[in-house]
A protein has these predicted regions:
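Flexible, active-site-adjacent loop/turn segments at secondary-structure boundaries
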Residues: 136, 337, 401, 409, ...
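Contiguous, well-ordered alpha-helical segments that form the cores/surfaces of helical PPI scaffolds
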Residues: 409-422, 442, 603
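Long insertion/accessory domains within large nucleic-acid-processing enzymes
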Residues: 591-628
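Conserved catalytic cores of very large enzyme subunits
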Residues: 4-405, 426, 430-593, 599
């Protein structure tokens, strides 16, 4: 053992709610609640075991110094993976088993939605990252319900002796069907935000809305009805304790832009207008361009896993592409700013240090991989035996799923912006500095390709969505290198390849610039534009959406969606400094600063956060400039 147990103080402080670091570690967990505290206690034990027994000293040292970040150490003691695309289609069509109970193919849309939420909860409790489901997998059950409603209505007519002409009959069927679809969609929305998983939080789930995923025209029309209802209900929001509709954090929604919904004369353009209206009010959906994704992903369009982690195309033995039922093994992030500062602006030394740090990341990633190796399917039957990921037998290991690119493992990166600014004295948006930024991306890709060739494991680079870690990285950089203007003078560093939040740039130039980095971020990334309240300017939102379709694979619009429970203010709650210099949230109307009496929703790491953030991330949110 390298040291004795060190968890006592951490655990006691989080139980008594006086551990500021834990309080603001995750913007979707309320650390005062018993179930969340139990998860955090387990996390402290896992971190302690990982530090003392499971991870090599050089990995722990690099993690503590902020050279790398070994993600989710609080779950590393267990044999758990990160995120996945749930094969909901297989589970609904062929049945599944939940908690030892056989669940057969549902006989209605509403039942399918109910089963889907049970699957979501079970999956979330057996992994630590996000999951994605597709509404296309629910669409076949619309016709099943339609047929059932038709039968029931005919029986009612026969029983009552009532006669209906075919047109009226069909209208009544469709009205009842719409009501059932509304109930089913509402079930998913409310179950997701009210469920509590073993992780002490609502499931991190993404709902994918892709019309061209439907298998036939009727199914596509039915899918469009589900999408329409999903957007309408999200636009409305969910009620808080005061009974006021607010913006929920989950499920995250992704809407795919495609040929028949992107132009005004497109058959499904009305859905895109509804999506734009929803985004302007509720921050979602986010947008994937079918056109750009197909260019980058061998002609395929598919969901990201949770927030942004992306699979690479993979074919089965029959040469058929497969995406659902695949997963990510885990993430280790490289602090690019530390690489730059360690080089002292010597470019040759920079590349030497970069290669050394990449090897360190490889060792850390192999620790993640080896922790999963040998895991029995019995560890999480819902995942490995009953269809969410696979249909393995009891007692089988998951090893075959860890190789040959079936699953991915991610080399994350952060601070490309500050890294390049230090090395060149310029923003990476400057034409003189951009080539270095692209070379850094290519160097990381080359390393991943080399490792993949040597091991057959699906390495890929990933634009890390730092949440609390942004503050940690900033503080370790300041400690090691001091405060350097434009580089370490903030309490945060920039996520992935993003343009610095303070840099003036319009939405269209930002998306165009970042698109070239997104295409190099093979393991996933997302771009965003910061916008003011756009509810009265939907045409501008639609203009940005059309630009996304033509120029970038995956992007989102960030707006503000807040509510003060003291005075009823519905607008942007502001970030100000208190007497001690600490950043706090204050209602501009009544001055309320009690976080328990306000609802604040901001996008901080791809997901919407609603439980507030540490000082570093709060400063980053305050510093964001508008792009429109």
């Amino acid at each position: 053992m390298r040291q004795a147990n060190t968890t006592d103080n951490q655990i006691l402080s989080l139980i008594e709610c006086n551990n500021e670091e834990v309080k603001q570690e995750n913007s979707n967990k309320n650390p005062t609640i018993n179930s969340v505290q139990r998860d955090y206690m387990a996390g402290e034990v896992s971190k302690d075991i990982s530090r003392r027994l499971l991870l090599p000293p050089e990995i722990i040292e690099a993690h503590d110094q902020g050279i790398i970040h070994f993600h989710d150490m609080d779950y590393f003691a267990q044999h758990m993976h990160n995120c996945d695309l749930v094969n909901l289609d297989d589970m609904l069509q062929n049945g599944t088993v939940i908690s030892g109970t056989m669940i057969e193919k549902p006989h209605s849309f509403s039942t399918a939605c109910n089963i889907a939420t049970q699957i979501i909860a079970q999956v979330a409790s057996n992994q630590y990252g996000g999951q994605s489901i597709s509404l296309a997998h629910l669409a076949p059950f619309v016709q099943i319900s339609r047929n059932s409603i038709r039968r029931d209505l005919r029986e009612e007519c026969e029983m009552t002796g009532q006669k209906m002409d075919e047109k009226l009959f069909d209208a009544v069927v469709e009205k009842r069907l719409r009501n059932e679809i509304a109930r089913g969609v509402q079930t998913i929305q409310y179950q997701v935000v009210t469920l509590m998983t073993t992780n002490g939080q609502a499931p991190f789930v993404t709902v994918f809305m892709y019309l061209n995923e439907a298998r036939n025209e009727q199914e596509k029309k039915d899918l469009s009805i589900i999408i329409e209802e999903t957007l309408k209900q999200r636009y409305q929001g969910v009620k808080n304790e005061a009974g006021v509709f607010i913006t929920p954090a989950f499920p995250k929604l992704i809407y795919v832009l495609e040929e028949d919904n992107i132009t005004e004369d497109g058959e499904y353009y009305y859905l895109t207008r509804l999506a734009a209206k929803c985004t302007a009010r509720r921050l979602v959906p986010d947008y994937i361009s079918e056109k750009k994704m197909k260019e980058l992903k061998e002609g395929n369009c598919f969901p990201v896993m949770g927030c942004r982690s992306a699979l690479t195309p993979w074919r089965d033995a029959n040469g058929k592409y497969k995406f659902y039922g695949r997963f990510n093994q885990g993430v280790v992030t490289l602090n690019l700013v530390d690489v730059a500062l360690s080089s002292g602006k010597d470019l040759d030394l920079f590349w030497k240090i970069m290669d050394e740090r990449l090897e360190l990341c490889y060792k850390a990633l192999m620790c993640r991989h080896n922790r999963l190796k040998g895991t029995l399917s019995d560890a999480a039957p819902i995942l490995w035996q009953h269809g969410a990921i696979a249909r393995l037998k009891k007692g089988e290991t998951i090893d075959p799923l860890l190789y040959n690119g079936y699953s991915t493992i991610s080399l994350g990166y952060a601070g490309l912006c500050e890294c390049v600014r230090y090395m060149t004295g310029k923003s990476h948006t400057d034409p003189e500095a951009t080539p270095l930024a692209l070379d850094i991306m290519k160097r990381m890709n080359a390393a991943c390709n080399k490792w993949k060739k040597e091991t057959t494991i699906g390495f890929g680079i990933y634009g890390t969505p730092l949440e609390s870690t942004t503050y940690k990285f900033a503080k370790t950089l300041q400690k090691r290198f001091g405060v350097i203007p434009g580089v370490t003078d903030k309490n945060y560093i920039t996520n992935s390849y993003h343009v610095h939040v303070t840099e003036p740039i319009d939405a269209f130039h930002k998306l165009s610039f970042e698109a070239q980095f997104q295409s190099l971020s093979t393991g996933g990334a997302i771009s965003y534009v910061e916008v003011p309240n756009m509810q009265n300017n939907l045409e501008a939102v639609l203009q940005v959406i059309r630009f996304i379709y033509d120029n970038i694979m995956y992007a989102e619009l960030n707006t503000k969606s807040d509510y003060c429970q003291v005075c009823g203010f519905d607008g942007e709650i502001q970030i100000v400094k208190d007497e001690s210099g600490k950043l706090i949230w204050r209602c501009p109307k009544c001055g309320n600063t009690d976080q328990s009496k306000m609802n604040v929703a901001r996008r901080t790491c791809g997901y919407i956060g609603s439980q507030f953030w540490n000082q570093g991330r709060t400063q980053e949110i305050r510093d964001r400039v508008l792009h429109l």
